[in-house]
């Protein structure tokens, strides 16, 4: 019974995501990403539902149903070891789950530092793509009917490393040449880390790091230890954080659809609870005193 129900749920998500695949991608740097101008316009590679050869970082907007949208926004960074993006299972399926919570999702295609011949770095280029995505969403908040003070990041595995690099580290100084979007804050209002990798865990968490929801499997030798370490650092710094470690669970259980364990299957419900408890799912909610960024950039 449970297997059949999960199969139907996965099939429905697959069909929905096939339609969602037609959604346009919004390029974050129309004239080419800094340092990647020579590869601007180069075609991506898609094998099954995995994407690689990304040189023009972009976000695909998956808007929540207008009848239930609450104004929250989440930028999703799929995993894939910085070699490819697990676009369906850790991108579009996650977007659909957030949409059911009334959240508008922005699925990020970022530059892949370990894609053969890419020449990119994780801490430099890929993290810059995530920061630009946060700024871009804030700049276009009015267009997509989201609250610029309720913009979160969500990262899976390698994407979790990017989320941590952006949320839990100081942003580097801006280059001499910037545009209006670059002048907005790149610090997300909250962070959701799904079996995040070890790169990006700070030596000491900052007291002004955004609230965190962290989830991993207890048998995940890659990503359970950094999940625990980051949680302990955030708590020590006085940052609100919640950690879920699921028993007998390994890596890459995605949004629960790859597991038969009920606790794994229902972990997105715990995320919904956390978002609600933090006030992120209601207009004007979230942390008090967070300044609103500048108006929309046209």
Where are these regions (language model features)?
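Bacterial N-terminal signal peptides that target proteins for export
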Residues: 1-11
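Serine-hydrolase catalytic machinery in alpha/beta-hydrolase-like enzymes
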Residues: 26, 32-60, 65-74, 79-146, ...
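Short beta-strand/loop motif that positions the catalytic acidic residue
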Residues: 214-216
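N-terminal signal peptide c-region/cleavage motif recognized by signal peptidases
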Residues: 17-19
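Primarily recognizes the serine-hydrolase "nucleophile elbow" in alpha/beta-hydrolase
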Residues: 128-208, 289-295
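C-terminal catalytic histidine-bearing segment of alpha/beta-hydrolase fold enzymes
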Residues: 237-298
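Conserved alpha/beta-hydrolase "acid-adjacent" motif
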Residues: 221-227
